[in-house]
């Protein structure tokens, strides 16, 4: 290769590297934004799950009390 071809090839490689660097920063910014959005969604889902846990426990407690009342009625009927 002569010197001119080497310079042209070097310029093309350098230009490609610079363009790739710019697009990578934009992609990194987009990915960072996506991660923040997903983190917020995970936090919201975690809060929803915690709220459901307390609702489920309340429903279990109500069911246990209802079963106890039924057991008491059945034992009174059998006496």
Curated annotation (Swiss-Prot):
A Pfam family annotated for this chain is LPP
Cross-referenced InterPro entries, in alphabetical order?
Answer: Lipoprotein_leucine-zipper_dom, MOM_Lpp
List where in the cell it is found.
Answer: Cell outer membrane; Secreted, Cell wall
Q: Where is the signal peptide?
A: 1-21
Q: What induces it?
A: This gene is probably poorly expressed.
Gene3D superfamilies for the chain: 1.20.5.190
Lipid attachment locations (S-diacylglycerol cysteine)? 22
Where are residues bearing N6-murein peptidoglycan lysine located in the sequence?
79
* Coiled coil regions, renumbered to chain: 28-76
- Annotated spans, Disordered: 60-79
Q: sequence repeat positions in this chain?
A: 25-35, 39-49
Q: How does it sit in the membrane?
A: Lipid-anchor; Peptidoglycan-anchor
Keywords, A to Z?
Cell outer membrane, Cell wall, Coiled coil, Lipoprotein, Membrane, Palmitate, Peptidoglycan-anchor, Repeat, Secreted, Signal
Which coarse location class describes where this protein primarily resides? membrane
> Please, where does N-palmitoyl cysteine lipid attachment map on the chain?
22
Q: Which domain of life is it from?
A: Bacteria
**How is this protein organized at the quaternary level?**
Homotrimer.
What is the role of the protein in this entry?
A: A highly abundant outer membrane lipoprotein that controls the distance between the inner and outer membranes. The only protein known to be covalently linked to the peptidoglycan network (PGN). Also non-covalently binds the PGN. The link between the cell outer membrane and PGN contributes to maintenance of the structural and functional integrity of the cell envelope, and maintains the correct distance between the PGN and the outer membrane.
Family per similarity comment: Belongs to the Lpp family.
Q: What is this protein called?
A: Major outer membrane lipoprotein Lpp 2
Gene from which the chain derives: lpp2
């Amino acid at each position: 290769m002569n010197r001119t071809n080497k310079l042209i090839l070097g310029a093309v490689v350098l230009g490609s590297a610079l363009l790739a660097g710019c697009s990578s920063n934009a992609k990194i910014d987009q990915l960072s934004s996506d991660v923040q959005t997903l983190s917020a969604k995970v936090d919201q889902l975690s809060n929803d799950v915690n709220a459901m846990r307390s609702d489920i426990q309340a429903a279990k407690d109500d069911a246990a009390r209802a079963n106890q009342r039924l057991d008491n009625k059945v034992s009174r009927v059998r006496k």
